[in-house]
């Protein structure tokens, strides 16, 4: 049988196995990954802050729009009631005018009948 395989020995600390150029020490790699992760977290936090600001701004605009819609609804209701009152007023004026016109026509007919048949 052959001799058991031994793991390659590293010449210097942080040297790559197989005799290649030495890689960064494991502590540096984890620091770099930690920094990248922190940068990503900061980026996400910034994006979330912007999103929260936009949501608050949108909420304020919606609140203002709701207030304006309520005011418009109140104005429309007031307009509707005043228009109904005005319509009724002019309907009665029109009725009075028709009654007066009918009375004048009746008087003219009576005068003509009396004039010709008397």
UniProtKB/Swiss-Prot annotation:
Membrane-spanning parts: 97-116
Side Vesicular, residues: 117-118
GO molecular function terms attached to this record: SNAP receptor activity; syntaxin binding
GO BP annotations listed: SNARE complex assembly; vesicle fusion
Highest taxon, organism lineage: Eukaryota
Protein name: Vesicle-associated membrane protein 1
Coiled coil: none
Assembly with partners or alone: Interacts with VAPA and VAPB.
Record flagged with keyword Nucleus: no
Annotated v-SNARE coiled-coil homology domain residues: 33-93
Family statement drawn from the similarity comment of this UniProt entry: Belongs to the synaptobrevin family.
PANTHER family for this protein: SYNAPTOBREVIN FAMILY MEMBER
Keywords: Coiled coil, Cytoplasmic vesicle, Membrane, Phosphoprotein, Synapse, Synaptosome, Transmembrane, Transmembrane helix
Function: Involved in the targeting and/or fusion of transport vesicles to their target membrane.
Any one Pfam family match given in the protein's UniProt record, by short name: Synaptobrevin
Residues recorded with modification Phosphoserine: 63
Organism from which the protein derives: Bos taurus
Gene Ontology cellular component list: neuron projection; plasma membrane; SNARE complex; synaptic vesicle membrane
Gene: VAMP1
Biased composition range(s): Low complexity: 1-15
Chain positions covered by the region annotation Disordered: 1-36
Cytoplasmic side: 1-96
């Amino acid at each position: 049988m052959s001799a058991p395989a031994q793991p390659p020995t590293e010449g210097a600390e942080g040297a790559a196995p197989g005799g290649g150029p030495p890689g960064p020490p494991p502590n540096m790699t984890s620091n770099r990954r930690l920094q990248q992760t922190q940068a990503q977290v900061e980026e996400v936090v910034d994006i979330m802050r912007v999103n929260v600001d936009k949501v608050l701004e949108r909420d304020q605009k919606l609140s203002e729009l709701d207030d304006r819609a309520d005011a418009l609804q109140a104005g429309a209701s007031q307009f509707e009631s005043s228009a109904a009152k005005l319509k009724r007023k002019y309907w009665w004026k029109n009725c009075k005018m028709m009654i007066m016109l009918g009375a004048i026509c009746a008087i003219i007919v009576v005068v003509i009948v009396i004039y010709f048949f008397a």
